[in-house]
Amino acid sequence: MRMYDLITKKKHGGELTAEELRSMVEGYVAGEIPDYQMSAMLMAIWFCGMTAEETTALTIAMADSGDRVDLSAIAGKKVDKHSTGGVGDKTTLICAPIVAACGGRVAKMSGRGLGHTGGTVDKLEAIPGYETAISREKFFSIVNECGVSVIGQSGNLAPADKKLYALRDVTATVDSIPLIASSIMSKKLAAGSDCILLDVKTGSGAFMKTLDDAIALAQTMVAIGEGAGRRTVALITDMDTPLGHGIGNSLEVAESMDVLRGKGPHDLTEVSLQLAENMLYLVGKGTIEECRRMAEQSIADGSAFETFCTMVRRQGGDDAVLRDASKFPQAAVQMEIRAGADGYITAMDAEKIGETSVVLGAGRETKDSPIDFAAGLILHKKYGDAVTSDDVIATLYTESTQRGESAAQLFRAAITIGKEVPPSRPLVYARVEKDKVVRY
């Protein structure tokens, strides 16, 4: 079949068959279909959309373009979790060991951060000695032993997605729900878990800025997962303001350990528990209510924290920093930011705060940028809090005063202080299952 004919069919709103989509993906990965033709197809998809059947078929073809991870060597049902990305979003470090401590199996392949959103692999590499690149055999062995292992993504996981994403990035076709959904889910399907929980963020620090768009993306991804035979559920969670208080790699690890020891901030604890209870529900550990009680108990009895420490030791990491965060390498410069006015914090732009952390050295401006694991910021005040002019609302951590001053300017632009108490916002907006959306 000719690519020209497929482009023409989609341009006129036609539905591509699974065979046509597979031929297209295989031809593009093999270099037989040029970028200019694939660019035309991407734009046709952007304008005309795709049916659920098309999107699922495209995703499966992308997942089949590289390695498929066979997790059958791991006993029991495996559950994966994916976040669409946010600021201060360290929930994998919390919900994965909770699920493992409750008898679930989490074989997690995570990515690095780029732009204003952080990556789980970068956070874990802030732990001295922690290895994110280990053999498949060791990966499986650790999951069988302690229920969880988190490693970096394989270089050959869904290579079609890597190639298509690079093209979407330069052809203004990133913001297409079928293309976003197939990009995310192709990697999830290739990663091999039986069940998938999706954390779809919405708000200023998220890719999907509106609730309706976030729900539409979640519905599409859930339909793909279910269509590919994976039990899939999505939660829509808030990312209008950062999650928790710490932003930056070692700072986020330390805060995650606070949550696992029952001492973490309410927002981060609650979102992590809701994610964990749904992961446990997906692998059949009980009703949502029963799974919630199990998750809470794993924090109360210390088993979730000890599970995380065991995983870290098995992957070469020093768990002393998990027990005492002062043992992490410390930033050379600390800078306090004061409110400068009396009132209430009425806006805390998560995207700008994420960009602040990048300027401080905690994130990447390009994929090859080095990371300062000690850099970042701690928020002492959050959205809705009352402040006086002299209150310290954040502390910045970085390697130089120059970086700190540049970041401080950006941070101040992210904060709005008003005279009225702002309306409260839910942490979780909705739960999306196959053919069902429950709004909270």
Predicted regions located by residue number:
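N-terminal glycine-rich anion-binding loops that anchor highly charged ligand groups
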Residues: M1, K10-A73
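Well-ordered secondary-structure scaffolds
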Residues: D5, K10, E15-A18, Y28, ...
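Alpha-helix C-terminal capping segments
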Residues: F47, L93-A107, K187-G192, I224-A228, ...
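Active-site cofactor/substrate anionic-group-binding motifs, chiefly glycine-
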Residues: G49-S110, L114
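Short glycine/serine/threonine-rich phosphate/pyrophosphate-binding segments
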Residues: V87-A96, A100-A101, K108-M109, G115-G118, ...
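Short beta-strand segments
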Residues: M109, V143, I151-S154, I184, ...
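A glycine-rich helix N-cap at a beta->alpha junction
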Residues: K123-S149, Q219-G225, G229
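Phosphate/diphosphate-binding glycine-rich loops and adjacent basic-rich segments that engage nucleotide
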Residues: N144-C195
